[in-house]
Amino acid sequence: MLGVRVLAVTIPTLYLWLTVNTSWCALLFLALLILTGAMTPTEVWAGSMGHFAVITMIVFSILNYALKETGVIDRAAAWFISRRIAKGRPLVFLGLFFLSNLIIGMFVDNLSLAIIYVGLAIALADKIGVKRGDPFYACLFIGILWCNVIISIASPIAHAPVLILIGMIETQLGITISYAKWLCVGVPFAAVMFLAMMAAVTVWRPNAKAFLDFDTASLKPEPLSRKGKITAGIFLLTVLAILLPEVGKVVFPGHFAFWSQIGVVVPAILAVCALCLITVDGKPVLDFRAACSTLPLPAILFAGVVCVMSTPFSAESTGISSWLSGLLQPIFQGLSPFGTLALLAIAALVMTNFLSNVVTMVLFFNIGLALLSGSNLHLGAFAAVIGVAASMASLTPSACAPAPLIFGPGHVTVRGVLKANLVFLVLSLAACLVVVYPLASAVFG
Protein backbone atom coordinates (compact mmCIF):
# COMPACT_ATOMS: atom_id res chain seq x y z
CA MET A 1 0.00 0.00 0.00
CA LEU A 2 2.92 2.35 0.66
CA GLY A 3 4.03 2.14 -2.96
CA VAL A 4 0.47 2.71 -4.17
CA ARG A 5 0.24 5.88 -2.07
CA VAL A 6 3.55 7.18 -3.49
CA LEU A 7 2.38 6.54 -7.06
CA ALA A 8 -0.97 8.13 -6.25
CA VAL A 9 0.76 11.44 -5.49
CA THR A 10 3.62 11.16 -8.00
CA ILE A 11 1.59 10.56 -11.18
CA PRO A 12 -0.72 13.58 -10.65
CA THR A 13 2.35 15.68 -9.79
CA LEU A 14 4.02 14.73 -13.07
CA TYR A 15 0.82 15.67 -14.89
CA LEU A 16 0.70 19.06 -13.13
CA TRP A 17 4.36 19.69 -13.97
CA LEU A 18 3.63 19.09 -17.64
CA THR A 19 0.36 21.03 -17.84
CA VAL A 20 0.48 23.74 -15.13
CA ASN A 21 3.95 24.61 -13.80
CA THR A 22 6.84 23.23 -11.77
CA SER A 23 6.84 25.77 -8.93
CA TRP A 24 3.91 25.52 -6.49
CA CYS A 25 3.18 22.02 -7.82
CA ALA A 26 6.65 20.98 -6.67
CA LEU A 27 5.99 22.29 -3.16
CA LEU A 28 2.68 20.44 -3.14
CA PHE A 29 4.50 17.19 -3.90
CA LEU A 30 6.69 17.59 -0.79
CA ALA A 31 3.62 17.90 1.42
CA LEU A 32 1.89 14.95 -0.24
CA LEU A 33 5.02 12.80 -0.01
CA ILE A 34 5.09 13.27 3.76
CA LEU A 35 1.40 12.36 3.95
CA THR A 36 2.10 9.03 2.21
CA GLY A 37 4.30 7.97 5.13
CA ALA A 38 7.05 6.81 2.76
CA MET A 39 9.47 9.36 4.24
CA THR A 40 9.55 11.35 7.46
CA PRO A 41 9.32 15.16 7.33
CA THR A 42 12.99 15.43 8.32
CA GLU A 43 14.02 13.09 5.49
CA VAL A 44 11.94 15.02 2.95
CA TRP A 45 13.32 18.44 3.96
CA ALA A 46 16.90 17.17 4.10
CA GLY A 47 16.62 15.39 0.75
CA SER A 48 15.00 18.33 -1.04
CA MET A 49 15.73 21.84 0.24
CA GLY A 50 18.76 20.52 2.14
CA HIS A 51 20.23 18.92 -0.97
CA PHE A 52 23.55 20.33 -2.21
CA ALA A 53 21.97 21.12 -5.60
CA VAL A 54 19.87 23.87 -3.99
CA ILE A 55 22.69 25.87 -2.39
CA THR A 56 24.82 25.29 -5.49
CA MET A 57 22.17 26.82 -7.75
CA ILE A 58 21.74 29.79 -5.41
CA VAL A 59 25.43 30.65 -5.18
CA PHE A 60 26.26 30.14 -8.85
CA SER A 61 23.20 32.15 -9.90
CA ILE A 62 24.61 35.06 -7.88
CA LEU A 63 28.00 34.65 -9.55
CA ASN A 64 26.29 34.51 -12.94
CA TYR A 65 24.57 37.82 -12.14
CA ALA A 66 27.95 39.41 -11.39
CA LEU A 67 29.42 38.18 -14.67
CA LYS A 68 26.46 39.49 -16.64
CA GLU A 69 26.19 42.88 -14.92
CA THR A 70 29.89 43.68 -15.26
CA GLY A 71 29.90 42.85 -18.98
CA VAL A 72 32.27 39.89 -18.76
CA ILE A 73 30.00 37.58 -20.78
CA ASP A 74 29.27 40.15 -23.51
CA ARG A 75 32.92 40.96 -24.05
CA ALA A 76 34.02 37.33 -24.05
CA ALA A 77 31.46 36.57 -26.77
CA ALA A 78 32.46 39.60 -28.84
CA TRP A 79 36.13 38.62 -28.64
CA PHE A 80 35.47 35.26 -30.28
CA ILE A 81 33.40 36.47 -33.22
CA SER A 82 35.62 39.47 -34.04
CA ARG A 83 38.62 37.31 -35.07
CA ARG A 84 40.14 38.17 -38.46
CA ILE A 85 40.02 34.54 -39.55
CA ALA A 86 36.22 34.81 -39.82
CA LYS A 87 36.23 37.61 -42.41
CA GLY A 88 34.63 36.38 -45.63
CA ARG A 89 34.26 32.86 -44.21
CA PRO A 90 30.64 32.31 -43.09
CA LEU A 91 31.22 28.78 -41.78
CA VAL A 92 34.20 29.95 -39.72
CA PHE A 93 32.17 32.86 -38.37
CA LEU A 94 29.29 30.56 -37.39
CA GLY A 95 31.78 28.14 -35.86
CA LEU A 96 33.32 30.89 -33.72
CA PHE A 97 29.86 32.16 -32.74
CA PHE A 98 28.81 28.67 -31.63
CA LEU A 99 32.17 27.91 -30.00
CA SER A 100 32.03 31.09 -27.92
CA ASN A 101 28.56 30.09 -26.72
CA LEU A 102 29.74 26.60 -25.77
CA ILE A 103 32.91 27.71 -23.97
CA ILE A 104 31.29 30.56 -22.03
CA GLY A 105 28.27 28.37 -21.33
CA MET A 106 30.38 25.76 -19.58
CA PHE A 107 30.71 28.21 -16.69
CA VAL A 108 27.46 30.23 -16.56
CA ASP A 109 23.72 29.64 -16.41
CA ASN A 110 22.49 28.58 -19.84
CA LEU A 111 19.14 30.41 -19.78
CA SER A 112 20.77 33.75 -18.94
CA LEU A 113 23.36 33.11 -21.62
CA ALA A 114 20.62 32.35 -24.16
CA ILE A 115 19.03 35.73 -23.44
CA ILE A 116 22.39 37.45 -23.96
CA TYR A 117 23.12 35.56 -27.18
CA VAL A 118 19.67 36.20 -28.64
CA GLY A 119 20.30 39.93 -28.19
CA LEU A 120 23.76 39.53 -29.69
CA ALA A 121 22.39 37.59 -32.68
CA ILE A 122 19.74 40.25 -33.36
CA ALA A 123 22.45 42.93 -33.43
CA LEU A 124 24.70 40.78 -35.62
CA ALA A 125 21.90 40.04 -38.09
CA ASP A 126 21.21 43.75 -38.43
CA LYS A 127 24.89 44.54 -39.10
CA ILE A 128 25.30 41.66 -41.55
CA GLY A 129 22.11 42.57 -43.38
CA VAL A 130 20.09 39.38 -42.91
CA LYS A 131 16.51 39.30 -41.64
CA ARG A 132 13.88 36.87 -40.40
CA GLY A 133 13.18 34.24 -42.99
CA ASP A 134 16.74 34.24 -44.31
CA PRO A 135 18.52 30.88 -43.79
CA PHE A 136 21.66 32.52 -42.37
CA TYR A 137 19.51 34.41 -39.86
CA ALA A 138 17.78 31.18 -38.81
CA CYS A 139 21.13 29.41 -38.54
CA LEU A 140 22.39 31.96 -36.01
CA PHE A 141 19.37 31.43 -33.77
CA ILE A 142 18.94 27.66 -33.96
CA GLY A 143 22.67 27.43 -33.20
CA ILE A 144 22.05 29.31 -29.96
CA LEU A 145 19.46 26.70 -29.00
CA TRP A 146 21.75 23.81 -29.94
CA CYS A 147 24.57 25.26 -27.84
CA ASN A 148 22.14 25.81 -24.98
CA VAL A 149 20.97 22.20 -24.78
CA ILE A 150 24.56 20.95 -25.00
CA ILE A 151 25.94 23.11 -22.19
CA SER A 152 22.91 22.42 -19.98
CA ILE A 153 24.18 18.85 -19.52
CA ALA A 154 27.89 19.04 -20.43
CA SER A 155 28.94 21.10 -17.40
CA PRO A 156 27.78 20.94 -13.78
CA ILE A 157 28.81 24.55 -13.11
CA ALA A 158 25.57 26.56 -12.67
CA HIS A 159 23.47 24.01 -14.61
CA ALA A 160 20.52 22.54 -12.72
CA PRO A 161 19.92 19.36 -14.81
CA VAL A 162 23.45 18.10 -14.13
CA LEU A 163 23.22 18.89 -10.43
CA ILE A 164 19.89 17.08 -10.20
CA LEU A 165 21.26 14.05 -12.05
CA ILE A 166 24.45 13.91 -9.97
CA GLY A 167 22.27 14.08 -6.86
CA MET A 168 20.05 11.21 -8.03
CA ILE A 169 23.08 9.10 -8.96
CA GLU A 170 24.62 9.64 -5.53
CA THR A 171 21.37 9.04 -3.65
CA GLN A 172 20.16 6.00 -5.59
CA LEU A 173 23.38 4.37 -6.79
CA GLY A 174 25.88 5.43 -4.14
CA ILE A 175 28.21 6.81 -6.83
CA THR A 176 29.78 10.18 -6.02
CA ILE A 177 30.61 12.19 -9.14
CA SER A 178 32.79 15.27 -8.75
CA TYR A 179 32.67 18.25 -11.08
CA ALA A 180 36.01 17.20 -12.57
CA LYS A 181 34.75 13.69 -13.31
CA TRP A 182 31.61 15.00 -14.97
CA LEU A 183 33.63 17.43 -17.07
CA CYS A 184 35.86 14.55 -18.20
CA VAL A 185 32.72 13.23 -19.89
CA GLY A 186 30.96 16.50 -20.65
CA VAL A 187 33.82 18.32 -22.38
CA PRO A 188 34.51 15.55 -24.94
CA PHE A 189 30.75 15.26 -25.50
CA ALA A 190 30.50 19.03 -26.10
CA ALA A 191 33.47 18.86 -28.50
CA VAL A 192 31.82 16.07 -30.49
CA MET A 193 28.52 17.95 -30.51
CA PHE A 194 30.26 21.07 -31.80
CA LEU A 195 31.35 18.99 -34.78
CA ALA A 196 27.78 17.67 -35.05
CA MET A 197 26.47 21.24 -35.15
CA MET A 198 28.87 22.16 -37.92
CA ALA A 199 27.90 18.99 -39.80
CA ALA A 200 24.22 19.96 -39.53
CA VAL A 201 25.02 23.46 -40.84
CA THR A 202 27.06 21.98 -43.69
CA VAL A 203 24.15 19.72 -44.68
CA TRP A 204 21.82 22.72 -44.44
CA ARG A 205 24.13 25.08 -46.42
CA PRO A 206 22.32 28.35 -45.54
CA ASN A 207 22.76 31.15 -48.06
CA ALA A 208 25.53 33.38 -46.69
CA LYS A 209 25.91 35.86 -49.56
CA ALA A 210 25.13 38.86 -47.33
CA PHE A 211 27.91 37.87 -44.92
CA LEU A 212 30.70 38.02 -47.52
CA ASP A 213 30.91 41.83 -47.36
CA PHE A 214 30.68 41.99 -43.55
CA ASP A 215 33.75 43.18 -41.62
CA THR A 216 34.03 41.10 -38.44
CA ALA A 217 36.64 43.51 -37.04
CA SER A 218 33.81 45.99 -36.43
CA LEU A 219 32.68 43.73 -33.58
CA LYS A 220 35.91 44.19 -31.59
CA PRO A 221 34.88 44.52 -27.92
CA GLU A 222 35.66 47.46 -25.68
CA PRO A 223 38.07 46.87 -22.78
CA LEU A 224 36.61 45.49 -19.56
CA SER A 225 35.87 47.93 -16.77
CA ARG A 226 37.69 47.59 -13.47
CA LYS A 227 34.66 45.83 -11.99
CA GLY A 228 34.63 43.45 -14.95
CA LYS A 229 38.31 42.60 -14.56
CA ILE A 230 37.89 41.93 -10.83
CA THR A 231 34.82 39.76 -11.43
CA ALA A 232 36.51 37.80 -14.22
CA GLY A 233 39.64 37.25 -12.13
CA ILE A 234 37.74 36.04 -9.06
CA PHE A 235 35.54 33.78 -11.17
CA LEU A 236 38.56 32.17 -12.84
CA LEU A 237 40.12 31.58 -9.41
CA THR A 238 36.85 29.99 -8.30
CA VAL A 239 36.82 27.60 -11.25
CA LEU A 240 40.45 26.66 -10.56
CA ALA A 241 39.64 26.11 -6.86
CA ILE A 242 36.86 23.74 -7.91
CA LEU A 243 38.73 21.74 -10.53
CA LEU A 244 42.38 21.67 -9.38
CA PRO A 245 41.83 19.66 -6.15
CA GLU A 246 40.31 16.79 -8.15
CA VAL A 247 43.35 16.71 -10.43
CA GLY A 248 45.87 17.50 -7.71
CA LYS A 249 44.77 14.81 -5.27
CA VAL A 250 45.84 12.17 -7.79
CA VAL A 251 49.38 13.58 -8.01
CA PHE A 252 49.72 15.11 -4.53
CA PRO A 253 47.06 13.42 -2.39
CA GLY A 254 48.44 14.80 0.86
CA HIS A 255 48.21 18.42 -0.26
CA PHE A 256 44.85 18.36 -2.02
CA ALA A 257 42.87 15.84 0.05
CA PHE A 258 41.27 18.50 2.26
CA TRP A 259 40.35 20.82 -0.60
CA SER A 260 38.76 18.00 -2.57
CA GLN A 261 36.54 17.18 0.42
CA ILE A 262 35.07 20.66 0.95
CA GLY A 263 33.12 20.48 -2.30
CA VAL A 264 32.37 23.07 -4.96
CA VAL A 265 30.09 25.42 -3.06
CA VAL A 266 32.64 26.75 -0.55
CA PRO A 267 34.93 28.36 -3.18
CA ALA A 268 31.86 29.88 -4.85
CA ILE A 269 30.61 31.30 -1.53
CA LEU A 270 34.03 32.81 -0.85
CA ALA A 271 33.98 34.34 -4.34
CA VAL A 272 30.57 35.93 -3.73
CA CYS A 273 31.75 37.35 -0.41
CA ALA A 274 34.94 38.72 -2.01
CA LEU A 275 32.91 40.50 -4.70
CA CYS A 276 30.72 42.02 -1.98
CA LEU A 277 33.74 43.18 0.04
CA ILE A 278 35.80 44.67 -2.80
CA THR A 279 34.70 48.18 -3.72
CA VAL A 280 35.18 50.26 -6.87
CA ASP A 281 34.36 53.97 -6.70
CA GLY A 282 32.92 53.48 -3.23
CA LYS A 283 30.49 50.72 -4.26
CA PRO A 284 30.86 46.93 -3.95
CA VAL A 285 31.58 45.04 -7.16
CA LEU A 286 28.54 42.86 -6.44
CA ASP A 287 25.22 44.29 -5.27
CA PHE A 288 24.12 41.29 -3.22
CA ARG A 289 20.55 42.48 -2.67
CA ALA A 290 20.05 43.07 -6.41
CA ALA A 291 21.60 39.68 -7.20
CA CYS A 292 19.26 37.90 -4.78
CA SER A 293 16.25 39.56 -6.40
CA THR A 294 17.13 37.81 -9.68
CA LEU A 295 17.40 34.30 -8.22
CA PRO A 296 15.32 31.78 -10.23
CA LEU A 297 13.35 30.62 -7.18
CA PRO A 298 10.90 28.34 -9.06
CA ALA A 299 13.81 26.50 -10.70
CA ILE A 300 15.62 26.20 -7.36
CA LEU A 301 12.54 24.77 -5.65
CA PHE A 302 11.99 22.38 -8.54
CA ALA A 303 15.58 21.13 -8.38
CA GLY A 304 15.28 20.38 -4.67
CA VAL A 305 12.02 18.50 -5.11
CA VAL A 306 13.31 16.41 -8.02
CA CYS A 307 16.35 15.39 -5.95
CA VAL A 308 14.15 13.76 -3.32
CA MET A 309 11.60 12.31 -5.74
CA SER A 310 13.64 9.24 -6.67
CA THR A 311 14.18 8.15 -3.06
CA PRO A 312 10.75 6.54 -2.46
CA PHE A 313 10.85 5.01 -5.95
CA SER A 314 13.97 2.98 -5.18
CA ALA A 315 13.14 2.21 -1.53
CA GLU A 316 12.46 -1.46 -0.81
CA SER A 317 9.63 -0.47 1.51
CA THR A 318 7.55 0.90 -1.38
CA GLY A 319 8.20 -1.95 -3.83
CA ILE A 320 7.83 0.44 -6.79
CA SER A 321 11.13 -0.52 -8.41
CA SER A 322 10.28 -4.24 -8.35
CA TRP A 323 6.78 -3.54 -9.66
CA LEU A 324 8.09 -1.42 -12.54
CA SER A 325 10.64 -4.08 -13.42
CA GLY A 326 8.00 -6.81 -13.55
CA LEU A 327 5.68 -4.60 -15.58
CA LEU A 328 8.24 -3.58 -18.20
CA GLN A 329 10.39 -6.70 -18.49
CA PRO A 330 8.05 -8.41 -21.01
CA ILE A 331 8.27 -5.35 -23.29
CA PHE A 332 12.08 -5.45 -23.34
CA GLN A 333 12.37 -9.24 -23.30
CA GLY A 334 14.94 -10.47 -25.78
CA LEU A 335 16.86 -7.19 -25.85
CA SER A 336 20.41 -7.03 -24.54
CA PRO A 337 21.08 -4.60 -21.67
CA PHE A 338 22.76 -2.19 -24.10
CA GLY A 339 19.83 -2.57 -26.50
CA THR A 340 17.51 -1.65 -23.64
CA LEU A 341 19.70 1.36 -22.86
CA ALA A 342 19.60 2.47 -26.50
CA LEU A 343 15.81 2.11 -26.67
CA LEU A 344 15.36 4.12 -23.46
CA ALA A 345 17.70 6.82 -24.80
CA ILE A 346 15.69 7.06 -28.03
CA ALA A 347 12.43 7.28 -26.08
CA ALA A 348 13.88 9.97 -23.80
CA LEU A 349 15.15 11.94 -26.80
CA VAL A 350 11.73 11.89 -28.44
CA MET A 351 9.79 12.71 -25.26
CA THR A 352 12.06 15.57 -24.18
CA ASN A 353 11.39 17.46 -27.41
CA PHE A 354 7.75 17.81 -26.39
CA LEU A 355 7.79 17.68 -22.59
CA SER A 356 9.94 18.83 -19.65
CA ASN A 357 13.61 17.84 -19.85
CA VAL A 358 14.02 17.21 -16.12
CA VAL A 359 10.73 15.30 -15.84
CA THR A 360 11.84 13.15 -18.79
CA MET A 361 15.21 12.56 -17.15
CA VAL A 362 13.68 11.57 -13.80
CA LEU A 363 11.10 9.29 -15.43
CA PHE A 364 13.54 7.34 -17.60
CA PHE A 365 16.16 7.23 -14.86
CA ASN A 366 13.73 5.36 -12.62
CA ILE A 367 12.43 3.14 -15.43
CA GLY A 368 15.99 2.26 -16.40
CA LEU A 369 16.99 1.40 -12.84
CA ALA A 370 14.02 -0.94 -12.58
CA LEU A 371 15.00 -2.69 -15.83
CA LEU A 372 18.79 -2.71 -15.63
CA SER A 373 19.62 -3.11 -11.93
CA GLY A 374 20.62 -6.75 -12.33
CA SER A 375 22.51 -6.31 -15.59
CA ASN A 376 26.21 -5.83 -16.28
CA LEU A 377 25.71 -2.25 -17.48
CA HIS A 378 27.40 0.55 -15.55
CA LEU A 379 24.37 2.24 -14.01
CA GLY A 380 26.16 5.53 -13.47
CA ALA A 381 27.02 5.63 -17.17
CA PHE A 382 23.42 4.66 -18.00
CA ALA A 383 22.22 7.64 -15.96
CA ALA A 384 24.62 9.93 -17.84
CA VAL A 385 23.27 8.70 -21.19
CA ILE A 386 19.68 9.30 -20.09
CA GLY A 387 20.60 12.74 -18.75
CA VAL A 388 22.20 13.72 -22.05
CA ALA A 389 19.39 12.27 -24.19
CA ALA A 390 16.79 14.06 -22.07
CA SER A 391 18.62 17.36 -22.59
CA MET A 392 18.78 17.26 -26.41
CA ALA A 393 15.57 19.27 -26.85
CA SER A 394 15.57 21.63 -29.82
CA LEU A 395 12.79 20.47 -32.14
CA THR A 396 9.71 22.33 -30.87
CA PRO A 397 8.86 25.63 -29.12
CA SER A 398 8.08 23.69 -25.92
CA ALA A 399 11.23 21.57 -26.03
CA CYS A 400 13.16 23.44 -23.30
CA ALA A 401 13.16 26.69 -21.31
CA PRO A 402 15.13 28.79 -23.85
CA ALA A 403 13.17 27.43 -26.87
CA PRO A 404 10.43 30.12 -26.64
CA LEU A 405 13.16 32.78 -26.97
CA ILE A 406 14.08 31.26 -30.33
CA PHE A 407 10.74 30.09 -31.73
CA GLY A 408 8.37 32.54 -30.01
CA PRO A 409 9.41 35.81 -31.70
CA GLY A 410 9.67 34.04 -35.06
CA HIS A 411 13.47 33.97 -35.29
CA VAL A 412 13.09 30.41 -36.60
CA THR A 413 10.20 28.12 -37.52
CA VAL A 414 9.96 24.40 -36.82
CA ARG A 415 9.63 23.66 -40.52
CA GLY A 416 12.42 26.01 -41.56
CA VAL A 417 15.07 24.32 -39.40
CA LEU A 418 13.60 20.79 -39.41
CA LYS A 419 16.22 19.17 -41.65
CA ALA A 420 19.19 20.59 -39.75
CA ASN A 421 17.51 19.89 -36.41
CA LEU A 422 16.94 16.22 -37.25
CA VAL A 423 20.58 15.84 -38.29
CA PHE A 424 21.63 17.42 -34.98
CA LEU A 425 19.35 15.15 -32.91
CA VAL A 426 20.38 11.94 -34.68
CA LEU A 427 24.05 12.81 -34.18
CA SER A 428 23.38 13.65 -30.52
CA LEU A 429 21.85 10.19 -30.00
CA ALA A 430 24.92 8.61 -31.58
CA ALA A 431 27.14 10.69 -29.29
CA CYS A 432 25.17 9.47 -26.25
CA LEU A 433 25.84 5.83 -27.06
CA VAL A 434 29.30 6.03 -28.63
CA VAL A 435 30.91 8.81 -26.57
CA VAL A 436 29.04 9.35 -23.30
CA TYR A 437 28.48 5.72 -22.21
CA PRO A 438 32.06 4.42 -22.64
CA LEU A 439 33.61 7.58 -21.21
CA ALA A 440 31.28 7.63 -18.20
CA SER A 441 31.91 3.92 -17.57
CA ALA A 442 35.65 4.56 -17.45
CA VAL A 443 35.58 7.84 -15.51
CA PHE A 444 32.86 7.16 -12.92
CA GLY A 445 34.60 3.99 -11.72
Where are these predicted regions, by residue range?
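Transmembrane alpha-helix interface/packing and boundary motifs in multi-pass membrane proteins
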Residues: T13-T22, S100-D109, W146-P156, I346-V358, ...
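Juxtamembrane and boundary regions of transmembrane helices in multi-pass small-molecule transporters
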Residues: L63-V72, K131-W146, I151-L165, I169-G233, ...
